[in-house]
């Protein structure tokens, strides 16, 4: 269930400039922001997403911009462009 929650949260962030601004703030707590937005994700979900590599098919489907999760321990940042 958490993987689906993370994917839904990422989709919401890509469409919501308010969430993007919250996540861009220095020291933003991604898990807390997701929870406040109604999503249930964990730091483990973020770590797993960060380690995941894209397949050739995924790379072919990229239309621009990027999503990146960075950090250590409980501190993660999301870059949305």
From Swiss-Prot:
It comes from the Bacteria. There is a cross-link at residues 68-72 (Beta-methyllanthionine (Cys-Thr)). Coiled coil: none annotated. Pfam families: Nif11. Cross-links are proved in vitro, when coepressed in E.coli with the ProcM lanthionine synthetase. One of its GO terms (cellular component) is extracellular region. Residues 1-65 form a propeptide. Signal peptide: none annotated. It is found in: Secreted. There is a cross-link at residues 77-81 (Beta-methyllanthionine (Thr-Cys)). Its main location: secreted. InterPro entries: CHP03798_Ocin (IPR022516), Nif11 (IPR012903). Lanthionine-containing peptide (lantipeptide) with unknown function. Does not show antibiotic activity against Lactococcus lactis 117 and Bacillus subtilis 6633 bacteria. Organisms that produce this peptide live in oligotrophic environments at very dilute concentrations, suggesting this peptide is not secreted to influence other bacteria. This is Lantipeptide prochlorosin 1.1. It comes from Prochlorococcus marinus (strain MIT 9313). The lineage of its organism: Bacteria, Bacillati, Cyanobacteriota, Cyanophyceae, Synechococcales.
